[in-house]
């Protein structure tokens, strides 16, 4: 099979590999689509350690071709996911308390185990989430990572219908966060970005207020127009966005951190204490979160913006990512 494999010189080779036989509890997927994520770029570049030889991809959707012994959750013909959360230990405090993505023995697709950017992929059947009918595989691939990440973040913000939520960063992640906040949680959305083009799209997608934080004081405007957001989700990777989010929420507000800026965040501790503001981190989502995120997309409440590309384009896509030319989600199409 053809696969996108990381090389020692931080490149990706599209090469031929042979998969091993299935073990107990595993399933073989014939891949249809696999999204390309910034995390793939980090893995390729060795930012998280040398991953030479690994097959990239954690936004994969495939059709079950074969199941191994003991598999009851999947059957041939089902569509299922290859997600970042590939497998947990299944018995630690995190796995047993609904926080399985925090498992200290977690395996991650396209990082610690081979991922879905190949014509075929082996998954642990109980950890592969089924894709509902009516949801296209290309759209589902984006929900597998960006979608479930933002859905979980908005869920964790504890936002309620009619309340104000500020979304910082309206790129691939932020656009989906906006849709989940608006169309699933029925919140009023404040879109905050430094790019007017992204803000225009956000307004078209239903944002109630759009602010360019490069030219305006976003926190000040949010406080003046709404009395302070009830919550904020930060997908941007700039330290300034995190600091602004803390200033933009009202007393009792919650800031959910999703983006990973290289710098440390500055926190006004007295304000956090006196105004009861919470700052929490959110990492992807559980299998249940992904099931829910898929269903809302299948119902048409969330529509990822995707562009289909051939596997041969993978290095070009990474170059475009590094140059900031990507709009929406790039998806490798294995169906043609």
From Swiss-Prot:
GO terms for biological process: acetaldehyde catabolic process; DNA damage response; response to ethanol. Keywords: Metal-binding, NAD, Oxidoreductase, Zinc. CDD domains: CAD3 (cd08297). SUPFAM superfamilies: GroES-like, NAD(P)-binding Rossmann-fold domains. It is an enzyme of class 1 (oxidoreductase). Its EC number is 1.1.1.1. Binds 2 Zn(2+) ions per subunit. The keyword Metal-binding applies. Zn(2+) 1 binds at residues 37, 58, 145. InterPro entries: ADH-like_C, ADH-like_N, ADH_Zn_CS, GroES-like_sf, NAD(P)-bd_dom_sf, PKS_ER. Gene3D superfamilies: Medium-chain alcohol dehydrogenases, catalytic domain, NAD(P)-binding Rossmann-like Domain. It holds the Pfam family ADH_N. It catalyses: a primary alcohol + NAD(+) = an aldehyde + NADH + H(+); a secondary alcohol + NAD(+) = a ketone + NADH + H(+). Zn(2+) 2 binds at residues 89, 92, 95, 103. Its cofactor is Zn(2+). One of its GO terms (molecular function) is zinc ion binding. NCBIfam families: PRK09422.1. PANTHER family: ALCOHOL DEHYDROGENASE 1-RELATED (PTHR42940), VACUOLAR PROTEIN SORTING-ASSOCIATED PROTEIN 11 (PTHR42940:SF8). Belongs to the zinc-containing alcohol dehydrogenase family. Preferred specificity is towards 1-propanol. This is Alcohol dehydrogenase, propanol-preferring. The lineage of its organism: Bacteria, Pseudomonadati, Pseudomonadota, Gammaproteobacteria, Enterobacterales.
């Amino acid at each position: 099979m053809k696969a996108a494999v990381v090389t020692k010189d931080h490149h990706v080779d599209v090469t031929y590999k042979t998969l091993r036989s299935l073990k107990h509890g595993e399933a073989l997927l014939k891949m249809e689509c696999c999204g390309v994520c910034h995390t793939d770029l980090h893995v390729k570049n060795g930012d998280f350690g040398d991953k030479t030889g690994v097959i990239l991809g954690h936004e994969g959707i495939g059709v079950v071709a074969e199941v191994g012994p003991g598999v009851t959750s999947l059957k041939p013909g089902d569509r299922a996911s290859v997600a970042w959360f590939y497998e947990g230990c299944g018995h630690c405090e995190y796995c047993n308390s609904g926080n399985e993505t925090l498992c200290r023995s977690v395996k991650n697709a396209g990082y610690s185990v081979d991922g879905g950017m190949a014509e075929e992929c082996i998954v642990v059947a109980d950890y592969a989430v089924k894709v509902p009918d009516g949801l296209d595989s290309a759209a589902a691939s984006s929900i597998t990572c960006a979608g479930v990440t933002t859905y979980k973040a908005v869920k964790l913000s504890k936002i309620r219908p009619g309340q104000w939520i500020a979304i910082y960063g309206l790129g691939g992640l932020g656009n989906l966060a906006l849709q989940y906040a608006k169309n699933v949680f029925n919140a009023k959305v404040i879109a905050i970005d430094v790019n007017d083009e992204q803000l225009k799209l956000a307004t078209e997608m239903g944002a109630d207020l759009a602010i360019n934080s490069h030219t305006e004081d976003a926190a000040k405007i949010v406080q003046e127009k709404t009395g302070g957001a009830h919550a904020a989700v930060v997908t941007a990777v700039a330290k300034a966005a995190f600091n602004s989010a803390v200033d933009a929420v009202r007393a009792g507000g919650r800031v959910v951190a999703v983006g990973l800026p290289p710098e440390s965040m500055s926190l006004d501790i007295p304000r956090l204490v006196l105004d009861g503001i919470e700052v929490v981190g959110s990492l992807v989502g559980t299998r249940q979160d992904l099931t829910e995120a898929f269903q809302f997309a299948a119902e048409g409440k969330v529509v990822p913006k995707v562009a289909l590309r051939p596997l041969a384009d993978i290095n070009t896509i990474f170059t475009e990512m590094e140059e900031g030319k990507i709009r929406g989600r790039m998806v490798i199409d294995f169906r043609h």
